[in-house]
Amino acid sequence: MLELVRQTAPLPAWSDVKSFSLHDLRPLKPVSVAVTHERARLLATSGGLQVRQGTRSQVLREGQFMPLEPGHVTLESGGGAQAVIFEGSWGDELGGCGIFRADNVAAPSDKGDPVAYAKHTNIDAHYHDCQEFWLLLEGAATSVVSGQHLAMTPGDCLPIPMGAVHDMPDAPVPVKAVYFETTLRGQKRTGHLWQHTHGPAVQMEGK
């Protein structure tokens, strides 16, 4: 049975992501962060920020991301920003990463797998050849993973096993969220996979 994870709680043993942290940056107030795992990825979730680590410096805008090395990282923003850092152990072939939005609409379209529950959003039921992690930044939603319904609020992270059919059928408060797809495995197909097109979904972990 899956559980939602908050920032200070451990993720499942099978998870590629071992920890995550959200950072709200005030203007001209640098923040130092210690990266402790072998792999890390920073994603800008609002505004613009400068990331400095060792001799590297990179400016990111909302939706852009970069890898981090173990060690100290300095984050700074001229006008305020937010970023999330995922840490863990994953391979070199990854799926997607970014920000998505969802809200309830009058006539939702659905090209994904058929479902038995009511659909109110345009998010389709699908699976991946990798693990995926959803982190809710704004709004409220119900997500479904392998038939299990989970109510999400800001700060909740949902670890989704490889091959698990998942969906966000209800977003009564418009949602802004992060998605991070980790190591591609098996057939290493990218994007949304549907059983009616790509074959049966086989959940690999978290049963």
What label would you give each PLM region?
Residues 54-71, 146-163:
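Short acidic-glycine-tyrosine-enriched beta hairpin
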Residues 1-16, 30-33, 37-50, 56-59, ...:
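Generic N-terminal amphipathic/basic segments
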Residues 36-50, 127-143, 183:
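Short, conserved beta-strand element in jelly-roll/cupin
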Residues 23, 33, 42, 58-59, ...:
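Residue "hotspots" at secondary-structure boundaries inside conserved domains
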